[in-house]
UniProtKB/Swiss-Prot annotation:
Cofactor dependence: a divalent metal cation
GO terms of biological process kind: NAD metabolic process; NADP biosynthetic process
Organism name: Helicobacter pylori (strain J99 / ATCC 700824)
UniProt catalytic activity: NAD(+) + ATP = ADP + NADP(+) + H(+)
UniProt-listed Enzyme Commission number(s): 2.7.1.23
InterPro entries registered for this protein in UniProt: ATP-NAD_kinase_N, ATP-NAD_kinase_PpnK-typ_C, NAD/diacylglycerol_kinase_sf, NADK
Taxonomic lineage: Bacteria, Pseudomonadati, Campylobacterota, Epsilonproteobacteria, Campylobacterales
UniProt keyword annotations, A-Z: ATP-binding, Cytoplasm, Kinase, NAD, NADP, Nucleotide-binding, Transferase
Name of the protein described by the UniProt record: NAD kinase
A GO term from the CC aspect: cytoplasm
Chain sites annotated for binding NAD(+): 70-71, 139-140, 167, 169, 177, 180-185, 236
Active site (record annotation): 70 (proton acceptor)
Tagged with keyword Protease: no
């Protein structure tokens, strides 16, 4: 079979051998490859985060099956983002907020995929730039202190207009899809995953008046820190940000693409995965 629409890349995070679920992942990987063949799909494995190195291989796939948790899906989405390829997650692990299906439901999902009974969700992604270095973020870009002590001053601009100076441990710039990740842990708002906006949430801000801010995605943002800082991408990659060096962030021209069941409902996922609106005493 040479049909591009029948070719699925299987992504397992390259550090999975360090995972407590290593044995389960290895067994699941072999089972998944066999199932794909039985269902009439061509498949290949990718266990690297180097999208440039695997560019030709990535182009061969219609979509990518991400075997693991949300971290695995985030890594795959960044790796394939420039190639405009959709991904879907098969959960092995704990939360699985982004996952499309459990392992025991994969066969039905693949059959629905063949019959075009799967929906494609397109989400806003961030494109960041420091000097000549560009990168994509699916959940968030974080500007964080390099030093354990002291306060980091971050000047924020929308276009050429300064609108705030944050003084604290740092700043989260999240996507709506990422609003339920680090942003939520830092007491930022939940924003519907299909919205077109940025969420700016300060980390341990020095001022009582600072609150999270939601901005329309039409803005091009820039940030400067008064001293050397770290820029963290989806909690997985880091870049150095020199004092007074601008970090530019804008809406990526390419969307984050996730394949999901037609029956998936965002509010239901919030309730099931995060116990949204439930009593704190309710047992899962």
């Amino acid at each position: 079979m040479k049909d591009l629409n029948k070719t699925i890349g299987v992504f397992v995070r390259p550090t999975h051998h360090q995972n407590a679920l290593f044995k389960e992942l290895e067994q699941a990987k072999e089972w998944v490859l066999t199932l794909l063949e039985d269902e009439g799909f061509e498949s290949f494995m990718i266990d690297s985060l180097d999208g440039a190195k695997d560019a030709q291989l990535i182009k061969k796939a219609y979509a990518f099956l991400c075997l693991g948790g949300d971290g695995t899906i985030l890594g795959a989405l960044r790796m394939t983002h420039a190639h405009n390829k959709p991904c879907f997650g098969v959960r092995i692990g704990n939360l699985g907020f982004l996952s499309a299906v459990e392992l025991n439901g994969l066969k039905d999902f693949l059959q629905d995929l063949k019959q075009n009974r799967i929906k494609l969700e397109e989400h806003l992604a961030l494109e960041g730039r420091i000097g000549n270095t560009s990168f994509y973020a699916i959940n968030e870009i974080v500007i964080a202190k390099k030093k354990a002590l002291g306060v980091l001053d971050i000047k924020a601009c929308a276009g050429h207009t300064p609108f705030n100076t944050y003084k604290g441990d740092g700043l989260i710039i999240a996507t709506p899809l990422g609003s339920t990740a680090y942003n939520l842990s830092a007491h930022g708002p939940i924003v519907h995953a299909l919205s077109q906006s940025y969420i700016l949430t300060p980390l341990c801000d020095f001022s009582l008046t600072q609150r999270p801010l939601v901005l329309g995605a039409e803005f091009c943002l820039s940030f400067c820190a008064h001293e050397d800082a770290l820029v963290v991408i989806d909690g997985q990659a880091t870049y150095d940000l020199k004092a007074n060096q601008p970090l530019y962030i804008q809406k990526s021209p390419t969307t984050t693409k996730l394949l999901q069941k037609n029956s998936r409902d965002y509010f239901k996922v919030l309730k099931e995965k995060l116990l949204w609106g439930e009593s704190p005493n309710k047992k899962r």
